[in-house]
Amino acid sequence: MYSVEQSFVEWLAVKGYAASTYPPATGSEFVTVERTGGEVADLIDHPTVAIQTWAQTPMRAEEMALSIRNALFTSRPQGIANIAVNGLYPFWDESTRLPRYQLLLNCTAQLTD
């Protein structure tokens, strides 16, 4: 079964980012992927996806987010037909005290097995 989160995690790994659907216990620089909503109709999935970049400095977290955003304009994760970047903004994490940036994406994917 197709997973939009897994597709983004695999794509980010190819781009050189340590990515997961949850933050690791340790690490100073990583990326998380989370489906935050969206609708499904007639075997077409329209997920809203949040990609969060975490780093030691706000500048590096933003740099990572911008790099990922720019890469999305030239290649897409498997199964994703269309991506619109809906937002890019700082999103501090109070629990880890690490700087974090978030990309909010609206996507279109075909549901297939």
What does each of the following model-derived ranges do?
Residues 18-23:
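Short, well-structured beta-strand/strand-turn elements
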